[in-house]
Amino acid sequence: MSDFTEQTLRQKLANLSNHSNSIQTTSSWLLKNHNNREIIIRVWLKTVRKENKGAKVVNLLYVANDVAQNARKACPQFKDDFFPAIESAFRHCCELKAKEVENAIGKLIHVWKERQIYSQSQCKRLQEAHQQMKLSGSFPSPAGRNNGKNSQPNQFIVEEAKKNAQDVLVSLKRLQNPPSTERDIRIQLSKYPDNISCPEKLQSVQNSEEAKALLTQNEEALPMLEDYVKRLKEETKERESLETNLNMLIQNVRMSIEHHEKLCRDVKRKEDRIKADLLEVEKTFESLPDLTAEMPNAPLPTLEALFQKRK
């Protein structure tokens, strides 16, 4: 196994194939380097977003699946940290409109739900993304703008955007007074001597009394510090969730805008055609003889004159 570098990671993801050996080998390498999971997840998601071939995206999703399933014992945190990226990748797949990707996502959700890889609520969120992918065909895509078919408004996207907006508002409300801005606890923690947080400075302890005093201070600071760190982690997760919800909201709003812009273009085109037809009708109407006008008071031709005209 080679040492971990971001370039090596990119190369391995680029060389993925649909063979199980390729998927498993790459997955094992990722699990071995789980300490670099933040880089792995970031590069994996970026690779998925840049890929426009359905088969390549499926391979990347299968690698994530193998990592998530095998990380339960090796590194559970890897599996949990991977979820926001997986959800974001599922949302991105809506733009591909590839049947093979849609089928692969459906299978993965079923497996994760059945084997309890992810929780019921997490699987539900993934199912919503999958459903959004199924229904995204109702919206115009860059490749199909001129297909001449009128797509119908998708109520699901509207509801999804509303839900995203509500989630964003909830996250923003929770982050109004985050732990990272709590000045009092920072001041309180800073009052403790450096000895309790820096093992190198323990050499300055001269006797048992100083050691006991230091231990007492350590016991006082530890619960406070653990609680603060816990709340900071929760804040970090909340910020990650906010970022995910914002990305989802932007995507849904863009899809909705694209749909309504096409709808406006279609209506304008029909309006122009109706106006042109109306002008043509008016022009034809004006050229018709006026049947209400008085007929000229001229004598009718005689039978003899009619027969002469026929000859």
Swiss-Prot record:
Pfam families registered for this protein in UniProt: CID, CREPT
Matching SMART domains: RPR
Example GO molecular function: RNA polymerase II complex binding
Coiled-coil boundaries: 224-256
Keyword DNA-binding: no
Gene3D superfamilies: 1.25.40.90, 6.10.250.2560
Entry keyword set: Coiled coil
UniProt keyword Transport, yes or no: no
Domain CID: 1-134
GO biological process, one term: mRNA 3'-end processing
Name listed for the protein in its UniProt record: CID domain-containing protein 1
